[in-house]
Regions:
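Short, internal active-site loops enriched in acidic
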Residues: 168-171, 409, 556
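N-terminal alpha/beta PP-like core and its mobile active-site loop of ThDP/TPP-dependent enzymes
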Residues: 1-346, 398, 478-481, 518, ...
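Small/polar loops that bind or transfer phosphate-bearing groups
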Residues: 25-26, 49, 73-74, 219, ...
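Conserved short loop/turn motifs at secondary-structure junctions
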Residues: 219-223, 377, 458-460
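Phosphate/pyrophosphate-binding active-site segments
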Residues: 138-141, 179, 202, 207, ...
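Active-site diphosphate/adenylate-binding microenvironment
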Residues: 7-11, 15-20, 25-28, 33-38, ...
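Active-site phosphate/pyrophosphate- and oxyanion-stabilizing loops and adjacent acidic/basic residues
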Residues: 35, 59, 125, 232, ...
């Protein structure tokens, strides 16, 4: 029987699962991994500045690769530092394996330094509500069981992070047995309730009788299930307009004639008109929940008169919103494949309604798609955020990947950025932790080394996790960081200023030299004050061959293009 050290077993298993990178912060409780990493040459360790940053990097890696991300740090302070990042992954359904080191079993509850075992801090309990599984692995004997069980829980629907607290005994003990890959079991699994799906297809066909205005709202499930290509094929075949949620931006090309753009927060006028305009007969919701931002502050429930068909692998989402129409438990890919296979049965009705849909869509598109389009080419100073984002979109290759952080810049990017492919617009849209995109870009670049990566972030976000620019620079990753530096917590300031001078002051930030900060960390740094310099500076940064940061001196007094969303949320208080 084959035996190997616990650390070697873990690293070999990660390689067997297709991973090429491990994001980590070294520390005493994970020291045994250091010599093991020297033995496993197929796995590149990436050293983050902060344990939270390591998890954000793993999150970015997962989102960009379609695999899972792995992060490693010590228990106790390390696991507590990871908590927010793990929570962000859970709320967005990002598959992560988070591993923390723990003291030897015989030292638990004896005052050992950084003991976070179940008898003290109990970091598995800290992680439990943030993960799909949080478990202590006490010995190497049960490492094989818990490792594979954790990955099974991670890949099961809905996907999300898992946590293993690895005692010293588990790391240095001998693990018996060969590893059997887990991901392969899930690669072929496309669950679908056939009966519910067949009923949905009949309902779609019926809707094309007297009522033919059908649209799709595509959510993150389309991306998770690799269903974007099939969605495009079906939409084109029967002239079905497609809107996406902000989380799923890019799963349908936004320059496609059938694209409505984003619906919900930072959404387009076309998507709002199609879904809430009162003429829609049937809305096919693919892989999206009905959270606040993806439903225009839940107004889709009240304002849309359309019958809804909801396809999702998340049973909680289906049961919570079952009253909205017909629910189909299952993957978007499997449902769209069934739709393709049943084309002969549903084609007469869908084809009959296609001309009517084209007329309806043409009427919608006769109006402008975006709000305040004059802001895309303003030549005023300080620079308007929309102007900077438009210039960056022009500079970044079509298949480039944008990571967007949390703040006012998220609204500008969500509204004005054009995404053409799945996994090319990446943002933590549910929990929305500030600074997430800065380290996440490291993971994205590791997963997609041939793609150009740009981060749209803010000065408030830089205060949170800007130090991870040094990680990108350390590994000479050619990431371009664009800091929309408006000397404020943008969204919060826009609200606070209404209440007087002190609230506005409390939400303002000193005008830091972020370009100088980047240079101090080993990156190239540029400062732009004149919008006429944006194009040349972005090109220079993209050509730098290493990490670059552009400090864009931006205007904070710029209302965000979320007018439709605000109309639905007028009675509520917001913060981001």
């Amino acid at each position: 029987m084959t035996t190997k050290l616990g650390t070697d077993y873990i690293l070999d298993a990660l390689v067997a699962e297709g991973l090429a990178h491990l994001f980590m912060v070294p520390g005493g409780l994970v020291d045994p991994f250091l010599p093991a990493l020297a033995r496993q040459t197929k796995l590149q360790p990436v050293i983050a500045a902060h344990e939270g940053g390591a998890v954000y990097m793993a999150d970015g890696y997962a989102r960009a690769s379609g695999r899972f991300g792995a992060a490693l740090g010590i228990g106790g302070p390390g696991s507590c530092n990871m908590a927010t990042a793990v929570a962000a992954a859970k709320t967005d359904g990002s598959p992560l394996l988070v591993m923390t080191g723990e003291v030897p079993v015989d030292l638990e509850d004896r005052g050992a330094f950084q003991d976070a075992s179940q008898a003290t801090l109990n970091d598995t309990a800290v992680m439990a509500p943030l993960t799909h599984l949080s478990q202590t692995v006490a010995t190497a004997n049960n490492l094989n069981h818990w490792f594979r069980h954790a990955l099974t829980a991670m890949w099961s629907q809905p996907r999300g992070p898992v946590h293993l607290s690895l005692t010293h005994d588990a790391l240095v003990g001998e693990c018996v047995g060969a590893y059997v890959q887990v991901a392969g079991f899930f690669a072929q699994a496309q669950p679908l309730s056939t009966e519910a799906a067949e009923t949905a297809l009949r309902l779609l066909a019926d809707a094309n009788g007297a009522k033919s205005r059908i649209a799709v709202l595509a959510g993150a499930g389309v991306e998770h299930d690799a269903a974007a290509a099939r969605l495009k094929e079906i939409a084109e075949r029967w002239s079905i307009p497609v809107a996406t949620t902000l989380r799923a931006k890019g799963v349908f090309p936004e320059d496609h004639p059938l694209s409505l753009g984003v619906f919900g927060y930072a959404g387009t006028r076309h998507a709002t008109a199609a879904i809430l305009g009162g003429e829609l007969d049937c809305l096919l919701v693919l892989g999206s929940g009905f959270n606040e931002r993806d439903t225009m502050h839940w107004t889709v429930r009240e304002r849309s008169k359309a019958f809804m068909i909801h396809v999702n692998t998340d049973m909680e989402e289906l049961t919570a919103n079952g009253e909205l129409g017909h629910v189909v438990p299952g993957s978007c890919h499997a449902f769209l494949d069934l739709m393709h296979k049943r084309a002969a049965d549903i084609a007469p009705a869908l084809t009959a309604g296609a001309a009517h849909r084209r007329e309806w869509l043409a009427a919608i598109k006769a109006a402008p798609r975006l709000y305040d389009i004059e802001n895309l080419s303003r030549r005023t100073t300080p620079i308007h955020p929309a102007t900077a984002i438009a210039a960056l979109r022009q500079a970044l290759p079509r298949d480039g990947i944008a990571l967007v952080d949390s703040g006012a810049h998220r609204a500008f990017a969500g509204h004005y950025w054009t995404a053409y492919e799945p996994r090319t617009y990446i943002s933590a849209t549910n929990l929305g932790p500030m600074g997430w995109a800065i380290p996440a870009a490291v993971g994205v670049q590791c997963a997609q080394p041939e793609r150009r990566i740009a981060v749209i972030t803010g000065d408030g976000c830089m205060q949170m996790h800007g130090i991870e620019v040094q990680t990108a620079a350390r590994y000479r990753l050619p990431i371009v960081y664009v800091v929309i530096n408006n000397s404020a917590l943008g969204n919060v300031w826009l609200r606070a200023r209404q209440y007087g001078a002190l609230p506005a002051e409390l939400t303002s930030i000193p005008d830091h030299d972020w370009a100088g900060f980047a240079r101090a960390l080993g990156a190239q740094g540029f400062t732009v004050r004149d919008p006429a310099q944006l194009d040349a500076t972005f090109q220079q940064a993209l050509a730098a061959g290493t990490t670059a940061l552009i400090d864009v001196k931006a205007d904070k007094n710029c209302p965000t293009p979320v007018y439709d969303f605000n109309a639905g949320a007028r009675a509520w208080s917001y913060h981001e």
